[in-house]
Amino acid sequence: MRRVWLALLAFLGVACITAAIAIPAFLVPQLRVVPLDLDITSVASTVPADGSAGERFPAVIFDRCSVSQPKARTLDAHLTQQRRSVIIEPSDKRQATLQSAQTVQIDRIRDADGKETDPPAPRADGDLKCDDGLLTATIDRVSVNRKTSVPNGTVSALQLEAAPEGVNVKDVSVQLPDRKGFQYKFGFNVKKRSYLYYDLNTRQDQPAKYVGEKTFNGVKTYEFVSEVPETDLSSLPNAQGEACLLYTSDAADE
């Protein structure tokens, strides 16, 4: 009986060692995929190009109320971007489709005379005016390979306007078939090298260059910088395939 117990204990010991080795080898590849319960909310504010803090008006935006005037104007502004990304269908063991709803809110503006204004919140009826605080609102949908996080082309579309009841979302969306770069999530096992980054505003893939390491809240991170070239956004097509022009003759006092 003693031999049996020793043999049993020896077997269990080997089994435990085997399990200790096999489980991580099995679990790690399974865990290194885009999770299907992904739900991320982020908030970011504009900062000057040099990254310094304290500037009240670090951005410059087009004065939409000047579109019908003889001369277009710009405004100094402070902006806040809010984004929520979740997983939607089609998603399975090979791919995950991310839906990212994003708004850019104008917190405050300053005109050429130095007058500061807090723009009004969007109106309840959804009718946008040229002086509204809502600058942009979009819903982006993109399918990615769960192992690499690279877009696979199954779904790649940008919704630019609300879809009324009975209207297919595709009818108010722009298809983005050539998207290749990372966007909402980097891949796994990131190296100190350049990667493609997809800039949704200009709808272009741009290189994101590794520039060094930074520590945030005690966590060591890699910093990547992407320089997006100046782009005429008015030439980008809308859902109807036409060049975008958000405002025509709206005035602030209408």
Regions found by a protein language model. Name each.
Residues 85, 95, 145-246:
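Extended beta-strand-rich segments in extracellular/periplasmic secretory proteins, especially
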Residues 247-253:
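Conserved small/polar residues in nucleotide/adenosyl-binding loops
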Residues 2-158:
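Solvent-exposed N-terminal domain segments of exported/luminal and surface proteins
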